[in-house]
Amino acid sequence: MFDDALHFVANLLEAPDWERLGVHLPYEWIEQAVTYTGAASIRHRRLPAEQVVWLVVALALYRHKSISEVLDDLELALPDADVRYVSKSAAAQARQRLGAEPVRWLFEKSARAWCEQDRQAYLFKGLQLFAMDGTTLRTHDTPGNREHFGAQNYVGDTVASYPQVRGVTLTMLPTHLVRDAVFGPYGTSEMLYAKELVPNIPDDSLTVFDRGFLSAEILCSLAAGGSNRHFLIMAKSNTKWELTEGSEQDGIVRMRVSPQARKKCPELPEFWEARAVEMVDQANRKRTLLTSLRDRRKFRSADIASLYSQRWSIETSYRELKQTMMGMALTLRSKTVEGVYQEIWGTLTAYNLVRLEIAKAALDAKCKPTDVSFIRAFHIIQFELHWAAVTRSYGKLPSSMKHLRERLVSLLNEQRPGRSCDRAVKARPLRYAVRKVKKLP
């Protein structure tokens, strides 16, 4: 029986088809990425630059596997009659030759194209909805990574055990597709990274910010730099303003720009205005939201409060990246600075691939993309790539994609019921019996 099973696996199952997701990530984009960035392979190699780009994206989908296993399972290397397998060192050298710029170009190209797909289905009164937030990732503790990225400093001159990468992402609220991202050294503040992202925010949009980004320079440049670009942010407890119109629950306020901010950015005015909307959070605490949506008839205060409550769902995007895709790994794979950047752009591209499939499946099922389980979708895509034995004929690709989306929406996320009993903290069970001895007086 075991011999029959081996024969079935070896001879009957087709090789995994990486072109399975080529309907979303066309090969033309891969060629353009390596051509525009000057990373195209001149010599005939088993791992040309185009295949290495696929490899970087695949490594993010299969974080629990080594680079050699991913190469063999997905058959990314070109066939060679003399050498059957590609060594780990050859794959590492191929990644070094590629660099990070082609993968970054591919992410930016694909992210903009995917965010424009079905955008009409997710508009809020004519506006696209985005959210901006920051996160950190650990890297291997190598001299190069520690020198370039730096690490967190604690009290008493204590430094974190691992270097860290700090980044800020611009994510679509309805679909959680990452539209744009900026990453770099840990010592650079999120405010500076956010300033780099603001010019890339599209017109006719509303961006929901974490209150840590409350800055006149960021918010004023967002509203003035494009056409019909708006912001929504929670005010800090020490934010001071003067009410000029309306009521304290919903009115127009005027705030003074600090002299330090005007010194850094002379274009800023002395005062800037926003609409202040009072809301009550889940803990029954009064909060104030600041927004540039000043039309009270078109944008009611209840709508604005509901939009800001959706911002918290973006936190799950980082959890999906770090826990589900990275498998709770302590650090990234790469040990070089260029490799770290390359891996991050590849991971974001892979994450968007999964999120795009979820969005397509949600449209077919007429439900919200956030109602579809990311973990289930991620596991299904992994399984499909390996064992579905999809033919390489593009004629059968649409039926395969339809089958995938039907599986994704078969079990939607359910709202958890409220707590039925009081919360209790229990002692952690010990592996061995412990006898406690009382101290003698």
Predicted segments, located by residue:
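DNA-recognition alpha helix
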Residues: 66-82
